[in-house]
Structure formats: C-alpha cells, structure tokens
C-alpha cells in the first residue's frame, strides 16, 4: 500500500532513462521528502550530523578521519555482476573467495573502472554532464575493482579520489591521511577505511560547511526487506513474492536481480536462492549491504538473529602500518594486506543490558535478565 500512497524507492536516472544506481543510493541519504525523496517513512527533521561528518572526513582535509568500517563489511558488498565476492572465512581468517564472481585481491588495476553514471566522486575528470564516469581510477587495488555501486558510495579506501580536496586519499602510515607516528593516533583510519556514505559530498571541514541532510529513521527499502524476511520465515514457498521485494532493492542498486532471463535493468538475472535457508542468507546479506552504517540496524539484526559469533573474535582491516603500495603478504611494509585490527569478546548475556540493582531493590517482583 506504500506505493499507492505516494511512497517509492528514491531513484535518479541517466540520460537514456536507465537507473543511475550511484546517484540514487547516494542522494537517497541527502534528499528531503519535499525534494522528491518519497522513500522516507520516518525521519527526524531537526538533526545534526556535524560530528559524524567531521570524524569521517580524512585528516589531511581537516577532518578527524577516524570513523571507518571493517574489512568484513568491505567483503560483504557484491561484485558488479551481483554475486558475492567472499562466501566465508577459513579458521585462520583467510577469505573464501567466490571464483565465479571474478573477485581478485591480488595486484592493481591497469585501466579505470568506468560506469554509466553522473556520479562525480570517483575521479578528477568526472563531470555530471558526462554519459559515463570513472568510479575507480587505474592503479586501484583489485579488491575494490568491479564492485557494486553501493560499495563506492559507502566506503573511502586508500587511493580513492576525494573531490573536496581534489586529490587521492593517502592512508599509508604517516601519510597525509594515515596513522601518524605520534600525536592523535586515533585521528586516522584504524582499519584502513573511512566512511563515505551519509557524508554529504559538499562537506568542507576547512570552512566548516556541512550541508543539511534528513535524519532518516526508517525508509521504504527497510519495509521491503522486512516483509521479504518475514514472508520467508512464515511461507517460504511464496518465492516469487519474496523475490519481488528483494529484487526491487537490487534493481535500484544496479546489480542483477534473482531469477531467469533479463531483469528490469536489462541485466542477466542470477540464479535465485534454492531453498529457505539460502533465501534467508540472501536476504540477510542484502540487509547488511543496503543498510550499512545506518543507525543500529546491523547490530539490531545480529541481536535478533542471535548470531553471537559475528560479534566476537577477530575483526580485520588493511595494514595501517604499511608504507608501500603492495599486496605482498610477506612484505611487512605492504599496506594492501589483511591485518587483525581488534579481537572482541561477546557473550550471550551481552544480548541485553542488565537491570540496574537499584531498580531490582525497589521492586522484588523484577527478575534480572539471564546470565547477569
């Protein structure tokens, strides 16, 4: 009924009428309801994201440059062909690469990654008037090449173009944006990545110009994936109805939809999940990517799914102490290699906060939550 009441996924289009997934996903975060963003269901109109933006902007551009993402999130994004790049991890933390996806984390690109989009954040020669623009320049680590549009809109990686400063970011150790040898050690990307998503592209910390953006609490894409998830648990045989709403999200994202034949973007569809378990995992992965870095959606999902193992153990990033553009695992100075950034502990009792002892003392009928 949402569509009948004027709500819709926010989309922008190329000159030929095709969906521009880069501009659609990016401006979904910045456009207000009265500017055509009918995806917003609930929002806080009076909200400040100054600190969020300030901590996401690179140190060399006068930001604090410490708000980033983990390697595990980078791994979760699909390839441009709609297939997952990483399907899991070995006991030693090594990624299990999906060879069918074309993913490669060895070497660097020799050609720019050019797509049909008006998005101008990918390289210095990008223009809104262009039919096509570079979204990843030549020389980009292959881990970041041929990924889906949501990846480039969401993650700022070493060597990416940063338009506000007209330069490529430098996350190498003691680099312009990297970890310093002394001083404010945390004002640098601890995992080798910073956030790009929800940081308005016109943000300029140098003159403290941070454009307004709505505080979106709930949007239509979440309603779609909530419905798909619930239906898969209740009536998994209704595959067509489930995929309808998953595919609506993937359509806007510019990646192949599930099914057979051509999808609405003219792309070859990829095989649909084979059973309820596979569908559950597909929906969960779509949620992780689509809602990355939006409030507590991911954490709340993990809690309600009771996936305790995701919340504990080793979390990876790139080698923030690396000084060389190298992906050689045997080179201690190589930046582009996986490194354990932090090891976290999480037990079952951490699914909930305890009730304060003062409250228990006031009401003998209250019972403490499990394991506290």
PLM region descriptions:
Residues 150, 226-227, 245:
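Short, hydrophobic/aromatic alpha-helical segments in well-folded domains
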Residues 10-88, 172-173, 177-186, 191-195, ...:
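Long, intrinsically disordered, low-complexity segments
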Residues 72-219:
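Flexible, polar/acidic helix-loop-strand segments at domain edges
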Residues 220, 227-229, 234:
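Structural register within alpha-helical repeat arrays
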């Amino acid at each position: 009924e949402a569509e009948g009441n004027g709500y819709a996924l926010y989309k922008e289009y190329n000159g030929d009428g095709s969906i521009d997934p880069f501009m659609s996903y990016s401006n979904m975060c910045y456009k207000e309801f009265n500017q055509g963003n009918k995806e917003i269901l609930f929002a806080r109109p009076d909200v400040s994201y100054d600190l969020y933006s300030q901590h996401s902007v690179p140190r060399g551009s006068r930001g604090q440059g410490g708000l980033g993402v983990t390697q595990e999130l980078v791994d979760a994004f699909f390839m441009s062909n709609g297939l997952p790049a990483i399907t899991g991890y070995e006991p030693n933390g090594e990624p299990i690469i999906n060879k069918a996806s074309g993913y490669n984390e060895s070497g660097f690109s020799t050609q720019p990654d050019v797509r049909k989009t008006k998005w101008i954040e990918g390289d210095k020669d990008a223009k809104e008037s262009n039919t096509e623009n570079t979204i990843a320049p030549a020389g980009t680590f292959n881990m970041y090449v041929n990924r889906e549009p949501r990846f480039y809109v969401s993650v700022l990686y070493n060597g990416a173009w940063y338009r506000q400063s007209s330069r490529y970011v430098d996350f190498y150790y003691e680099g312009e944006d990297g970890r310093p040898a002394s001083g404010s050690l945390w004002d640098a990307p601890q995992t080798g990545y910073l956030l790009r998503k929800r940081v308005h592209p016109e943000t300029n910390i140098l003159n403290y110009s941070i454009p307004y953006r709505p505080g979106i609490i709930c949007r239509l894409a979440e309603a779609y994936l909530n419905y798909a998830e619930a239906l898969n648990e209740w009536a998994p045989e209704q595959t067509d109805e489930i995929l309808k709403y998953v595919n609506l999200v993937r359509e806007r994202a510019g990646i192949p939809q599930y099914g057979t034949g051509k999808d609405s973007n003219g792309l070859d569809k990829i095989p649909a999940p084979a059973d309820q378990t596979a569908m559950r995992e597909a929906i969960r992965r779509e949620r992780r990517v689509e809602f990355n870095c939006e409030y507590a959606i991911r954490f709340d999902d993990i809690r309600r799914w009771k996936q305790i193992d995701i919340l504990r153990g080793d979390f990876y990033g790139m080698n923030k102490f690396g000084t060389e553009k190298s992906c050689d695992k045997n080179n201690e100075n190589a930046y582009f290699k996986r490194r354990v950034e932090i090891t976290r502990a999480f037990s079952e009792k951490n699914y909930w906060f305890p009730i304060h002892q003062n409250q228990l003392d006031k009401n003998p009928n209250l019972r403490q939550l499990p394991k506290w």
